Amino acid sequence: MLLCADADAASADLASGALACPSCGAGRLRPWGRGRERVIRLRGGATARLSPRRGRCGSCRATHILLPSWMASRRADAVGAIAAAAVASALHGTGTARIGADLGVPAATVRGWLRRLRVRAGAMRQDAMVVFGRLTAGCDAPFPEPSGSALGDALSAVAACAHAAITFCGRTAADWEPLLGLFGLARFLAPAPGS
């Protein structure tokens, strides 16, 4: 799976052979159809239907899905909804029943998101801080402040990356949720293998 903040640009890169294979690193990905259609719940109750592009490596023959970073692998809800739940819990102390009611999803779903993010919070924060350092190299950007919880610190680091990409790298505020996914939430939300 390749996460892409800009699905149209990623499709163009796939068509031109500009994407390197993440499996072998030697080959280039070429278009190889589409993945299965997914219905994703968005914040506010709307849904989106998407059949993500698939690429196949010319060297190792591995296939990879190009997943827009506003989605998370094997999750029915968009990163924006999951991020809102994580912020409400980690930074405001809101309970899962209330978060679920506000988002229109079962409390058990919210508990699953939060459980996965809490387990991976340290790694997510570490990765986000490395990216933050790259995005802000040579710039006067403040480091994210500690929040008092591992998940809160991870969310602050991911948000700092998204803010840095908007401030220093020409992204726009419309890219906020895809950037949150790209800088950690989509990847670290993936369910554990075999679950």
Show where each model-derived region lies.
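Intrinsically disordered, low-complexity regions enriched in Ser/Pro/Gly/Gln/His and often acidic
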Residues: 25, 105-106, 169
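Long C-terminal interaction/binding lobes of large macromolecular proteins
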Residues: 1-6, 17, 123-195
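Short, conserved DNA-binding cores of transcription-related domains
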Residues: 1-70
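Residue-level marker of intrinsically disordered, low-complexity segments enriched
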Residues: 37-38, 80, 103, 164
